[in-house]
Each structure stands twice: as C-alpha cells, then as structure tokens.
C-alpha cells in the first residue's frame, strides 16, 4: 500500500514538472543554485553565486537557492525555495541556467533553452562512476544500474567545471562526458589564492588561535556518504 502511494505521488510530481516545462516559458534572467541537493550552502555553487553578487548581477538576475530543511544565511538578493516542493519544480522548469554540484533526480530533464552547469564537488583521486567496480552509497547497491543512471544524468550536463588537465581527463572517462569542459579551477578554491598573502596567512592563524611561526598541516580525508 505504502509503495503504491509512493509511486502515485512520484508520477504526479513528474507530470507536474513536465506540465511546467510545456506551459511556462523559460525566464531569461533566472538562475537556480543547489549544493548537495539542498543540504548546504557551500562549495562551487556558493562561490559562483557570491561572485555574481559581488559584481551586482543578483540585482538583475533572479537567483534562486534550493534548501532542504531550514533556510540559509545567504547574502544578496537571492530567494530561497524548499527542495522537492512544487515551487521547486516550477523554478527548475523555468530557469535559464542550472548551477549544481551533484547529480539531480533523473526525471528532471533539462529543457530546450536551459543551460546546465555542473560544478562537481571534488578532485577525482578515488574511482568515480564508470571507473568504479563496486558501489556503496545510500540508495545504491547494483553497480550496473548505478552506472546506467549516472550516464543518463551526465548526458543532461552542458558544461562541467574542472580543476586541471588530470581532472579533465578523468572526468571525461569516468563520466562519459563529451561536451564542454571548463578547465578554470574550482570557484571555491579562489579564496586560497586571493588571501594567500603574508598578512592573509597571519590573520587566518590568529583567527584560529594557531602559532604564527609554525607551518600548519591540514588532514582532511574524503567524505563518504555511507559513513
């Protein structure tokens, strides 16, 4: 019974999204942003948005941020819409540009006239997607099914941001991505260069209470969604 209701609701959601795509025009000045499926305000989408805001683009563009549970403290003139709700589907259907850092639900096909910028969220030092031999992720257990769904999702991307030639090569192979690779570096890393000055380093150490005369080593193991 519960499973049947779930599938019925899913069909209604999909139908609503397709109706929005067919009935509502694309808003030429609308950009939607999403980090980790609405779970955070962070990563590359955050820093792309804040660059646009710093240069005044949020005054002329309708910038929409999706959130999962609670709204975030987002600067500028953006609006926030709860992830997965009907308004979310409407803004997805009518946006000119999507800026996301992870895969979206498979039924959310990018319509004609919309551009999808996939920023991704890390350097491919571990095996990804088609390079994987096993899958241990929440909601995923069959590697063949995982690869099939991943490939379908990738084929909706128009642009993929890459950090360096190594990442570009790995992404093309592991994601089966054949469209435009934006090998510009990650927007979230720009601050590491902008503030990489003697005074910037001292200020950072003082803020964290670290000794100014010592080198600092950061241990940051990769995140796993099954842990």
Please report, for each region that a protein language model flagged, where it lies by residue.
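A short, charged/proline- and glycine-enriched loop
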Residues: 24-31, 113, 212-215
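Short N-terminal targeting/anchoring amphipathic segment
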Residues: 31-34, 90-102
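Short, hydrophobic beta-strand segments that form beta-sheet elements in well-ordered domains
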Residues: 60-68, 97-100, 160-162
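Glycosyltransferases and closely related glycan-assembly transferases
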Residues: 50-58, 93-94, 106-116
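Structural alpha-helical scaffold elements that stabilize or flank donor/cofactor-binding regions
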Residues: 90-92, 109, 153, 210
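Active-site-proximal region of nucleotide-activated glycan assembly enzymes
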Residues: 101, 107, 111-199
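Conserved catalytic-core segment of nucleotide-activated headgroup transferases in glycan assembly
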Residues: 40-54, 174, 187-227
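N-terminal pre-catalytic "stem/leader" segment of glycosyltransferase-like enzymes
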Residues: 1-86
